[in-house]
Amino acid sequence: MPQLNGGGGDELGANDEMISFKDEGEQEDKISENVSAERGLDDVKSSLVSESENNSSSSDSEQTERRPQPRADLESYEKAREYFTEALRRQQDGGFFKSPHYPGYPFLMIPDLANPYLSNGALSPSARTYLQMKWPLLDVPGSAALKDSQSPSPGHLSNKVPVVQHAHMHPLTPLITYSNEFPPGTPPAHLSPEILDPKTGIPRTPHPAELSPYYPLSPGTVGQIPHPLGWLVPQQGQHMYPITAGGFRHPYPALAMNASMSSLVSSRFSPHLVPHHPHGLHQTGIPHPAIVSPVIKQEPNGELSPPVNTKSPGPNKKDEDKKPHIKKPLNAFMLYMKEMRAKVVAECTLKENAAINQILGRRWHSLSREEQAKYYELARKERQLHSQLYPGWSARDNYGKRKKRKRDNKTDSTPEDFSMRSKKPCVQYLPQEKMIDSPGSSHGSMLDSPATPSAALASPAAPAATHSEQAQPLSLTTKPERFPLLSKPPPSSSSSSSSSSSSGLPTPPLLSRPLPFALLTPPSPFHQAALHSHHALFQSQPLSLVTKSSD
């Protein structure tokens, strides 16, 4: 049987692709030699019998002329039988082929996905091994040899195998090789709908046991297949299902996947191969009529589920809105306004409700007790009638919703508001110009001592004193009996400082923040020290003036 040369192998695949045609040819040659040896023994026996019966040389020459023709028929028959037994044995192995293949039958090369990957998803060349997998999708190059014994052998066909893509295939499917037995436009015979299921009579896709083509696939395209491909490796007790992509002829033409649908499914699984879930297929490879793709079938359910959840609070809100708004009974003043409003509008040319209500309010207060008692009696009757009409009503029904909305809006901002309100009176958050410009408003009522801040402001050293007070260090707490004053007080403030020292009150020119009322009384030395330490905690400026304690 002819073998492929090296040039033919380079044309069929890439340099790193494993194509072993020589070993396959040698194995087939060995098989053919064994068969011919057995037939040679039979021929020798038959020739001996014929020579014993016919002792003429003419009969021997006739038998030698007749032998080649039956031998050719026997060779083709034995060849076909071996082919089917080999295919059956390989099918029982689980769809993966361990022995070499015939040279005329190309095979699918799928890399071992357990090996390490490169960063871009392709397999590393050093660690690349291949799994030989059946591709039960397209035509059989040697199928014509079973129909016609005069057809060329697969070895002759494999030299002319073009690597093209079927016209009816989806662009996502990888490149396949097929023999020139079928043109690209015509589908092969085993994919035509003439193949009927003997039980159901429905056109079906042939089972992998009936097909035996192996199609080469470049490792670069398979390198992008994601690792957890459970549909590639058959589980125990499961058969290998054909992959039904958008380009292959579907057993049910109405359920065939178009290009958009197959692209949608391919985006969920793999950029090159579009698997069909095995649970949607029968044992014969026929998809269930109600299932096209489980992914597409689940999307409407996912879209319908959120509205179901959102509709549950909807009826409650609608029921609350449908409840009639019950007005509260009118009080005496409202009854008076209802009666006198038309008169006021007729007397005055005012159209503003605020002005009209003001006039009505003045007139209501000008009424005597007897006149008002009449309206109070009407209001009491109004309340009784309202309680009879609406026994379970309360004013909270009308105001509960509004208060609840206000609470929901204010829950997030209430802690910040309280903290800001407490910090607003603090002088440290105000600019220093405002502190100096308006000392009387913030500090005038703080201390009831003879030394008021106004007397301190009258001196030229007052601004420096405020700055020094803001820069008081924490070491002031070490000497509780003594209080820092200016090292050189001016003559104008000497009387105030002496009077303050005799009274025992601290005389800082300006305090950094207002004091509570509990500290307005003359404090003890301990309270004074705590007060100064508390104010010193809020100061951030460095020490600018050296202060000395006065004895």
Curated annotation (Swiss-Prot):
PANTHER family: TRANSCRIPTION FACTOR 7 FAMILY MEMBER, TRANSCRIPTION FACTOR 7-LIKE 1
InterPro entries assigned to the protein according to its UniProt record, in alphabetical order: Catenin-bd_sf, CTNNB1-bd_N, HMG_box_dom, HMG_box_dom_sf, TCF/LEF
Biased composition (Low complexity): 46-61, 449-468, 493-505
Superkingdom of origin organism: Eukaryota
Bias-annotated ranges (Gly residues): 1-11
An example molecular function term from Gene Ontology annotations: RNA polymerase II cis-regulatory region sequence-specific DNA binding
The family this protein is said to belong to: Belongs to the TCF/LEF family.
Positions of the DNA-binding region: 326-394
Compositional bias per record (Polar residues), positions renumbered to this chain: 469-478
Principal subcellular localization: nucleus
Lineage of the organism: Eukaryota, Metazoa, Chordata, Craniata, Vertebrata
Listed name of the protein: Transcription factor 7-like 1-B
PROSITE patterns referenced in this protein's UniProt entry, alphabetically: HMG_BOX_2
Keyword line: Activator, Developmental protein, DNA-binding, Nucleus, Repressor, Transcription, Transcription regulation, Wnt signaling pathway
Record's compositionally biased regions (Basic and acidic residues): 19-32, 63-76
